[in-house]
């Protein structure tokens, strides 16, 4: 029998006092205890809420962006001995029960990274404007890197320790998701897409990326690809 894998859940959070408590409770319910919340200098009571739970809390002194928060969380998880790292959103869009299917291919040594894909699961009722943006992003990723992923900007991912050590996240903003895809291609990391459910509520839609932010991200990706 192989050793039990230490699974760490990394949650970047910015002004998520309204949802982070329920997110942590759901993760506990499904047996995930190694939870790392990175509070990216929230102005609300995100940190105060997190402190009521037995989880790791790291707080950035200034707001740096989701990419920076993810990098901070991954670095801490690696330092603390994680075998598998799962990145998970703080706004309640992701389901804790989906983590099992994400980590199984890694535990079985079938993949080094698994990418959650909401379009492979019919239960995800994706708003039409969001679907258009995500499909446009997928096309851009394919043209730039040759990887066809219809949901490259889904924050629900899992990676082995070895993959986490290979991945170099340089961007502080949302474009870090595209960097992960780029790193998979450049470093020939074995990956698989896994069907997951993404829940859309008024809260999560309000908190999510705005259309102008998405176009800004796409333009930065394209400029980076052209000029390196």
How should these model regions be labeled?
Residues 148, 169-172, 181-199:
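Catalytic donor-sugar/metal-binding loop of nucleotide-sugar-dependent glycosyltransferases
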Residues 39-47, 92:
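A conserved acidic beta->alpha catalytic loop
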Residues 6-8:
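Cell-envelope/extracellular polymer assembly enzymes that use nucleotide-activated donors
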Residues 62, 68-79, 96-174, 200-226:
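Acceptor/aglycone-binding surface of glycosyltransferases and processive sugar-polymer synthases
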Residues 82-91:
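Short beta-strand-to-loop acidic/aromatic patch adjacent to the donor-nucleotide binding site
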């Amino acid at each position: 029998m192989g050793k039990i894998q230490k699974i760490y859940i990394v949650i970047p959070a910015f002004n998520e006092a309204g949802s982070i408590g329920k997110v942590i409770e759901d993760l506990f319910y499904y047996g995930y205890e190694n939870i790392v919340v990175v509070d990216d200098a929230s102005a609300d009571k995100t940190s105060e809420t997190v402190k009521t739970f037995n989880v790791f809390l790291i707080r950035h002194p200034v707001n740096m962006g989701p990419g920076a928060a993810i990098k901070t969380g991954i670095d801490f998880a690696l330092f603390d001995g994680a075998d598998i790292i799962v990145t998970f959103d703080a706004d309640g869009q992701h389901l804790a029960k989906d983590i099992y299917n994400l980590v199984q291919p890694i535990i079985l040594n079938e993949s080094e990274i698994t990418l959650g894909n909401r379009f492979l699961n019919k239960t995800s009722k994706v708003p039409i404007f969001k679907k258009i943006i995500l499909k446009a992003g997928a096309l851009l990723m394919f043209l730039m890197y040759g990887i066809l992923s219809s949901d490259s900007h889904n924050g629900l991912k899992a990676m082995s320790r070895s993959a986490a050590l290979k991945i170099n996240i340089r961007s502080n903003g949302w474009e870090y998701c595209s960097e992960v895809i780029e790193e998979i291609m450049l470093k020939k990391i074995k990956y698989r897409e896994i069907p997951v459910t993404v829940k859309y509520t008024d809260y999560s839609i309000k908190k999510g990326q705005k259309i102008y932010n998405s176009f800004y991200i796409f333009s930065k990706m394209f400029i980076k690809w052209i000029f390196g």
